[in-house]
UniProtKB/Swiss-Prot annotation:
It comes from the Archaea. This is Ribosomal RNA large subunit methyltransferase E. It catalyses: uridine(2552) in 23S rRNA + S-adenosyl-L-methionine = 2'-O-methyluridine(2552) in 23S rRNA + S-adenosyl-L-homocysteine + H(+). One of its GO terms (molecular function) is rRNA (uridine-2'-O-)-methyltransferase activity. Belongs to the class I-like SAM-binding methyltransferase superfamily. RNA methyltransferase RlmE family. InterPro entries: RNA_methyltr_RlmE, RNA_MeTrfase_FtsJ_dom, rRNA-MeTfrase_E, SAM-dependent_MTases_sf. One of its GO terms (cellular component) is cytoplasm.
Length: 193
């Protein structure tokens, strides 16, 4: 762990409070501001490892929660997990068989970064497009979608694609996002189905 991480107050707070990463606070803040999750919602979390959003989701809903990631996710009581690629039709089918249609899809995933900003941003947008396709396949009409993306040249295209599928779409940068980051969340409510 680098010194940047050890000096990061949000990271240290997350560890102290038992969260797996600082990302927990991003979802908490989004929920407080936009109320995207209801108490009885069934939810799929794409790119769920290490499980920090799953930890938060478990406290926000009494519904079923499924985390999907390429990497294994350590057990969290009351959470179902599926190891696989969200772009794989077999994984999508398994998710739908496990939960049926759901009320919310969240995605805090990011591709492995290469250090080349434009390349990494393009890969993040492509991942966002795949997550949107997944969401459209499993969401109930009226459902919500929350996804992390990165601002850049291709961001408006992803935003427009999401706006075409949902009645209300907003962008939001959380307080827990590091200074200088191009990270932004898209909060999409009321899936057109």
């Amino acid at each position: 762990m680098g010194s940047q991480w050890s000096r990061d107050k949000v990271y240290l707070r997350a560890k102290h409070e038992g969260f797996r990463s600082r990302a927990s606070y991003k979802l908490i803040e989004i929920q407080e501001k936009f109320a995207v999750i209801r108490r009885d919602d069934n939810i799929i979390d794409l790119g769920a490892a290490p499980g920090s959003w799953l930890q938060v989701l478990r406290t926000l809903t009494d519904g079923r929660v499924l985390g999907i990631d390429l990497n294994p996710i350590a057990d969290i009581e009351g959470i179902e997990t599926l190891e696989g690629d969200l772009t794989d039709p077999v994984v999508q089918k398994q998710a739908k068989e496990m939960l049926g249609t759901v009320c919310i899809v969240v995605c805090d995933a990011a591709p492995k970064l290469s250090g080349h900003k434009s390349y990494d941003q393009a890969r993040a947008i492509a991942l966002g497009e795949e997550a949107l396709l997944f969401a459209c396949n499993v969401l109930k009409p009226g459902g919500n979608f929350v996804i992390k993306s990165f601002q850049g040249a291709d961001f408006p295209e992803l935003l427009a694609a999401i706006q075409g599928q949902f009645y209300a779409v907003k962008t939001y940068s959380t307080k827990a996002t590091r200074k200088g980051s191009t990270e932004i969340y898209i909060i999409a409510k009321n899936f057109k189905g």
